[in-house]
Amino acid sequence: MAGNLLRGPPLLLRAADKYPRTPKCARCRNHGVVSALKGHKRYCRWKDCMCAKCTLIAERQRVMAAQVALRRQQAQEENEARELQLLYGTAEGLALAAANGIIPPRPNYEVFGSVSSESNSESSIPKYELFPKSQLSSSTPPQQSGGKPVSAESDSAPGISSPDARHEGGSGSENGDSESFINSPVSKPLKDGEETPGSVSSLGSDSGSEIDKDEQEPSPSSVASRHMNAIDILTRVFPSHKRSVLELVLQGCGKDVVQAIEQILNNGGAQAPKAGAEETWTAERMLQSAQQLPAASATTAPSSRPMLPGAMALSNRSAFSPLQPNAPHFGADPGSYPLGTHLGLNPLRLAYSAHSRGLAFMTPYSTTGLMPTLGFRPPMDYAFSDLIRDRTMLHKEQPYASGLYGPLVNNTPDKQ
């Protein structure tokens, strides 16, 4: 009893024991006959039947066959693309495959649709010729008064245009051709008496000699324009100064804009210009200092910075001295220190001027309580490039200065 209960029905056991279901002929099944499909297709009784059911079966078979063929083709293309990516990289492999025709561009497939879009974008890029042959040839007509570009004339007159331009126009879209013609040097309007780069290169050594002559002999108009540009620069940098004063300073500096700016800055250019006699005095001082520059450069070693009237006095001072000392406090004449208060220089400008870059920016010290027992060497004895102006100013007889801050501060004459 227990064995009979555990045993299943005989039909299920027989179905499980048998082999899997074999495919049957669909045409025979439509007509009520069951026949195995293996070896039956050629001998089927209804293989040429045109009834509705058999026609539907034939259409279904055709669609399935097309899908299988498409999947096989896509799988083959993916394998080829994967191999090319391993060999040449991602983008280069796809571009090389598309160029060689291994993979035709398909708009409905993402990988190869990007390749086709890249090829279209490359065709629309404007192309430029380094040495256009149309410029070298003398077949180009002179520019008309209307100012039309050469590309319009070449389009209207087919006999005038060069074959290179026609070949370039054939490869690409019309929009790309118009952009390439507009951006190319061929399309720029030619003025009367103006030479193109192609004509200049075709002239040879004669044109080179003429260019050298032009460079060696500058025209007076170019010199005048350069001088005007220098004065304009000075007027823009110093709008509060008069133009005549700036012209005097520029002439004294040999028409050097940088040197003129340094002269004006060192003579109080940042402050507002003085009125009356003091303004003329400042202009005369700037002009004299600019004229003294060639003589000083001829006698002494060449220096990149101009020598101002107060430059030597400033260079002989120690870094520990006050930036703007009171001259009567040191017992000296107020007029002996030219960079005093009459020029309107504040300690900030004195510390960051062109000739005091070697001085450290610090608060002024009082000279009464700064270690009076120590004798400081003058700054000329130190090997600072910004402080050394002339080696002849060194103390030959005294190795150290007699005073605390040097001869100029202590109002002692310098021994030569």
From Swiss-Prot:
InterPro entries: DM_DNA-bd (IPR001275), DM_DNA-bd_sf (IPR036407), DMA (IPR005173), DMRT (IPR026607), DMRT5_1_DMB_dom (IPR046472), UBA-like_sf (IPR009060). The keyword DNA-binding applies. GO terms for biological process: regulation of transcription by RNA polymerase II; sex differentiation. It is found in: Nucleus. Keywords: DNA-binding, Metal-binding, Nucleus, Zinc. Residues 25-72 bind DNA. The keyword Metal-binding applies. It comes from the Eukaryota. Residues 133-145, 198-208 have a biased composition (Low complexity). Residues 133-226 are annotated as: Disordered. Residues 228-263 form the DMA domain. GO terms for molecular function: DNA-binding transcription factor activity, RNA polymerase II-specific; metal ion binding; RNA polymerase II cis-regulatory region sequence-specific DNA binding. GO terms for cellular component: nucleus. SMART domains: DM. May be involved in sexual development. Belongs to the DMRT family. This is Doublesex- and mab-3-related transcription factor A2. It comes from Oryzias latipes (Japanese rice fish).
